[in-house]
Amino acid sequence: MNFQEFRNKWFDLGCISPDQIYSWRPDFDKNNISNWSKKGLIIKLRNGFYLFPEHKTRSGFAFYVANRIYRPSYISLHSALAFYGMIPESVVQITSVTSRKTATFSNAIGEFSYKTIKPDLMFGYDVKPIDEGHSFLLAKPEKALIDLLYLYPFYNTKFEIEELRLDMDFIQNDLNKNLLKEYSKQIDCKALEKRVKLII
């Protein structure tokens, strides 16, 4: 198989794994992946996941990659807060939560960070389309905030909350406070409920 045939088959998918390739061509030579990666024809994201470089700068595609290379997961915490304009800082890492163990990956796309939460706390996210065939899972604003307060318990005073530099216009006018309270109660953590009250 030459690279052009490979590209024609998998380019639209964007992020691919050898398992997918072997299901298509059981006799596929795994050395092709290594050779094409060395030539820059594909980008290694982590063991078992590759990306065509043309997708590297596509808007929103880094979030799609984040979902793909470590499942199950969804974009949350600082990346989600920045996406909604709730915090002013640009976020260097792409932050997600997962029911798997905490992990980080660094590649040509960026740095990906995953924080562990319990499987029954994997809720409160939406499917965000990028284009036809590509989408990513993103925490709702309320769940991104809940995930942050749950995973970073040092945000337990007014001063620490202020250090987040949350957009108060968003908090007052756009944040669904009833949903925030509902998520907090669903997690059933008294310390978390106290931290939520510092915001609302």
Where do the language-model regions lie?
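Short beta-edge/loop segments at beta->alpha junctions of small alpha/beta modules
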Residues: 1-72
